[in-house]
From Swiss-Prot:
The gene is ccsA. This is Cytochrome c biogenesis protein CcsA. PANTHER family: CYTOCHROME B_B6 PROTEIN-RELATED, HEME EXPORTER PROTEIN C. It comes from Nostoc punctiforme (strain ATCC 29133 / PCC 73102). Its main location: membrane. GO terms for molecular function: heme binding.
Length: 353
């Protein structure tokens, strides 16, 4: 079997399947009453994942080394990682919205690798002496998996911002996302359903105003209690359209899964950076040389370290950590692709410069 022809067929097939899968997920979001679309989307992601795994395996057999030595191989490894993390996230959340945001990103990466890169960058070449090391598999694969996880987690955070329309949704629970989201507008909306007569304030403490309304019948007392969070912008609270319970439930799921996936990607990033330092010391005699790639890897680590610190230690929930994660999405792309293509250093692919 001609492995080069097989690889060419598989990379085009991966792109085509991801494109169709993206359309299926978007169609499922537009027509939620068609349940079979969700199953088709999951099947499409799984088939694309298998195609890319086969492509990377064929490249490994052909070249004789782990397929992460050039941009073409790393792009498909990244796409494979994104589809893998997607399948995990979708299985955990059981939400179609995961595919709505991850499928187009995976498709665009595959399209870039297949249709944009020059043919000489797609061909396998003998490894340079510095890359002939077991650290190639250890360092680069872990870094790429961390990028995949962090990107998917950040995409879900962006989806959270879209679902909540940027409103300051408050999570009543732990930072992991076990509580329920309730915006001020939603609390007002639910209070209108529970309270049949104008309530009178009974207490106020630490920025929370408690309102109670009681009605007695047959010796039973029904009490409706509404907690109103005092904000500096009451006009925004009053004018914000209340989110439906379905949106709130979806937002809770997205935030929870986003947090967990970023929590998976961050230790992978840490291990990858440490492995890279050890490899650099063996190859070049220095653990850290402030190469542009190393600098941006550190920036990426700091951004997501701040995200996890804010959630775990500072108790940030909802919109603020989602914005920080969305910023991390851009930083990951700069670290992975921007530095490699535009920068000059030991990690540059040298396409533009």
């Amino acid at each position: 079997m001609n492995l080069v022809v097989l690889q060419n067929w598989l990379d085009n097939a991966s792109f085509a399947i991801l494109f169709l899968t993206m359309l299926v997920y978007w169609g499922g979001a537009a027509f939620p009453n068609l349940p079979y679309l969700a199953a088709l989307g999951t099947a499409g992601m799984a088939i694309a994942n298998l195609c890319m795994a086969t492509l990377l395996g064929a490249r490994w057999i052909e070249a004789g080394y782990f397929p992460l030595s050039n941009l073409y191989e790393s792009l498909f490894f990244l796409t494979w990682g994104i589809t893998t993390v997607h399948l995990i996230a979708e299985s955990s959340s059981r939400s179609r919205l995961v595919g709505v945001v991850t499928a187009p990103v995976a498709m665009l990466i595959a399209a870039f690798a297949t249709m944009t890169l020059p043919s000489q960058m797609q061909a396998s070449e003998p490894l340079v002496p510095a890359l002939k090391s077991n650290w190639l598999m250890m360092h680069v694969s872990v870094m790429m998996l961390s990028y995949s996880a962090l990107m998917v987690g950040a995409l879900l955070a962006i989806a959270f911002l879209i679902v909540t329309r940027g409103q300051n949704i408050q999570l009543q629970g732990s930072s992991v996302g076990t509580g329920g989201y309730r915006s001020n507008g939603y609390r007002l909306h639910k209070a209108a359903e529970l309270i049949s007569q104008p309530p009178a304030p009974s207490a106020e403490n630490n920025g929370f105003a408690r309102f109670e309304s009681s009605s007695n019948g047959n010796g039973n007392a029904n009490t409706a209690v509404l907690n109103l969070v005092t904000t500096s912008e009451p006009q925004t609270v009053a004018s914000a359209e209340p989110l439906s319970p379905q949106r709130l439930s979806l937002a809770e799921t997205l935030d929870n899964i986003s947090y967990r996936i970023i929590g998976l990607g961050f230790p992978l990033l840490t291990i990858g950076i440490i492995a890279g330092g050890v490899w650099a010391n063996e190859a070049w005699g220095s653990y850290w040389s402030w190469d542009p790639k190393e600098t941006w890897a550190l920036i990426t680590w700091l951004v997501f370290a701040a995200y996890l610190h804010a959630r775990i230690t500072r108790g940030w929930q909802g919109r603020r950590p989602a914005i920080l994660a969305a910023t991390g999405f851009v930083v990951v792309w700069i670290c992975y692709l921007g530095v490699n293509l535009l920068g000059k250093g030991l990690h540059s692919y040298g396409w533009f410069f």
